[in-house]
Amino acid sequence: WPPVEGRPSCKRCGACTRMWPPEANRCVCDDIVPQCHEGCSKCEKVDTRSGKPLYQCQSFEYYNCAA
């Protein structure tokens, strides 16, 4: 797995794999962002009330999870 320092940040990690050590886990990030990170393999557009184009990475990836 990639080093923790090089992973994209995620404020709210949703579903995660259950591996040991914890650094081996991949998660789905629940953050809605202006642009998906480079390593995202399934970037989906999210409908918002503001009309601004926002996206969510819906694939399991390596993140630095805040929560």
UniProtKB/Swiss-Prot annotation:
GO cellular component: extracellular region
Any one GO biological process: negative regulation of endopeptidase activity
Tissue spec: Expressed in bulb (at protein level).
Gene3D superfamilies found in the cross-reference section: Cysteine Protease (Bromelain) Inhibitor, subunit H
Record keyword Magnesium present: no
Pfam families: Bowman-Birk_leg
Residues under site feature: Reactive bond for trypsin: R18, M19
Superkingdom of origin: Eukaryota
GO MF terms held by the record: serine-type endopeptidase inhibitor activity
Keywords for the protein's UniProt record, in alphabetical order: Disulfide bond, Protease inhibitor, Serine protease inhibitor
InterPro entries: Bowman-Birk_prot_inh, Prot_inh_BBI
Disulfide bonds: C10-C29, C16-C27, C36-C43, C40-C57
Family: Belongs to the Bowman-Birk serine protease inhibitor family.
Entry function: Serine protease inhibitor. Inhibits trypsin (Ki=12nM) and weakly inhibits chymotrypsin with (Ki=460nm). Does not inhibit bacterial subtilisin.
Protein's name in the database: Bowman-Birk type proteinase inhibitor A4
Species of origin: Hyacinthus orientalis (Common hyacinth)
Lineage of producing organism: Eukaryota, Viridiplantae, Streptophyta, Embryophyta, Tracheophyta
